[in-house]
């Protein structure tokens, strides 16, 4: 948006032939995050969904951490590395206690995406592994000063975005991430948050891992 075609004009004025629109579809796919942020004022959103063959996202005892095998988990971590932000919900953090770090072959990467936690009522435990590595942003519907302070002491940033029914405004959250120049968001959340994002039309791509 800072250039807005002026670069092409400058090249032409310098006597350089410039063709535009070549391989437009392929170029858009390569830059889907940036293009979505420029045209829709939000990042490209990719949601990971792991399910059993019969369509469930958790076991009968409520466990959801290891539905899929190591190959699927390693593939999912690859997408974490490509993202500008990893988005999850408080239910997932409380149930699975994930670190949600970007790793390749088990090695922690030097560049860690921003980790974003949707937690409407600040129920998260500051001792969760979520806060162990990288920058973290906790998004609530209404800030509680005491709870917020405990999270800030763990290095987290707090953002209050009130939506309907006392929940976080997810559309406003994506606009805020776009303002922070996040091009791609990788969602690793439970059925509630992922389903709500799909319902609102905020998911551009689904990564479905199905375990027999």
Question: Positions of the model-derived regions?
Answer:
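Active-site ligand-binding patch in enzyme domains
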Residues: 34-36, 40-53, 57-183, 192-195
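Conserved beta-strand edge residues that scaffold enzyme active sites
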Residues: 25, 165, 191-192, 212
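Conserved functional loop/turn residues at catalytic and ligand-binding sites
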Residues: 15, 181, 201
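Short beta->alpha connector loops at strand-helix junctions that form conserved
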Residues: 22, 161-162, 210
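Zn2+-dependent cytidine deaminase-like catalytic core
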Residues: 1-28, 142-144, 157, 196-198
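Flexible, gly/pro- and Lys/Arg-enriched active-site loops
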Residues: 199-212
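Residues at the N-termini of beta-strands
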Residues: 1, 85, 184, 204-205
């Amino acid at each position: 948006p800072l250039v807005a075609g002026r670069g092409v004009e400058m090249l032409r004025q310098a006597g350089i032939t410039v063709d535009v629109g070549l391989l437009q579809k392929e170029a858009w796919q390569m830059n889907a995050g940036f293009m979505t942020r420029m045209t829709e004022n939000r990042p490209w959103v990719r949601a990971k969904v792991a399910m059993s063959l019969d369509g469930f996202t958790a076991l009968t005892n409520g466990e959801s951490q290891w539905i899929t095998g190591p190959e699927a988990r390693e593939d999912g971590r690859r997408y974490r590395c490509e993202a500008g932000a990893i988005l999850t919900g408080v239910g997932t953090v409380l149930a699975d206690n994930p670190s949600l770090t970007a790793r390749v072959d088990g090695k922690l990467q030097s560049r860690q995406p921003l980790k974003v936690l949707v937690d409407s009522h600040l129920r998260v435990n500051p001792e969760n592994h979520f806060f162990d590595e990288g920058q973290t942003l906790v998004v609530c519907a209404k800030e509680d000063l005491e709870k917020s302070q405990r999270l800030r002491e763990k290095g987290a940033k707090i953002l209050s975005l009130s939506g309907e029914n006392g929940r976080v405004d997810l559309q406003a959250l994506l606009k805020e991430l776009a303002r922070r120049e996040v091009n791609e968001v990788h969602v690793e959340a439970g059925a509630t948050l992922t389903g709500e994002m799909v319902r609102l039309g905020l998911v551009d791509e689904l990564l479905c891992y199905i375990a027999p």
